[in-house]
């Protein structure tokens, strides 16, 4: 089954404008994300989806594939959906453009799980919060799920809980595509 990754990128981020083009260790955050996703061996193809000419120019500079999208998307997910409609992939991975440390092994594990278990339609990872300051941080998306690990909701606000454990979302989504 063809597995494609799409990295939605734009310059108008509300919390940190132009973050995709910020340089870290000599490369843009976007290039770091692309290279890590590209190194996941279960992913057949990687595209950057953007409407911003400056991002497209940067993508061309580091020789990545891209899909030019509609300018007025309200979310990265809608940008990925537009890009995915132009692809011939059974599974599409949405990797946020601000995840420069995304683990290629995590992407491989998620892709393998999605292929193995045909009942999964959407898959997204979470990680236990160990630093209690992250619970109050609106930049950290907290996740709530049921006993079967089905997501119930996500929030930037602290989540009231009884278990004493809080989880944060990692900016990756795998979706099974029916064309």
Each predicted region: which residue ranges?
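N-terminal glycine-rich phosphate-binding loop and ensuing alpha1 helix
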Residues: 2-49
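Short phosphate-binding loop-to-helix
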Residues: 47, 53-97, 101-112
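Short glycine/serine/threonine-enriched helix-capping/active-site loop
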Residues: 8, 123-125, 154
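Anionic-ligand binding region
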Residues: 128-171
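Short aromatic/basic micro-patch
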Residues: 15, 101, 174
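Short, high-confidence coil segments that cap the C-terminus of an alpha-helix
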Residues: 43, 89, 118-120
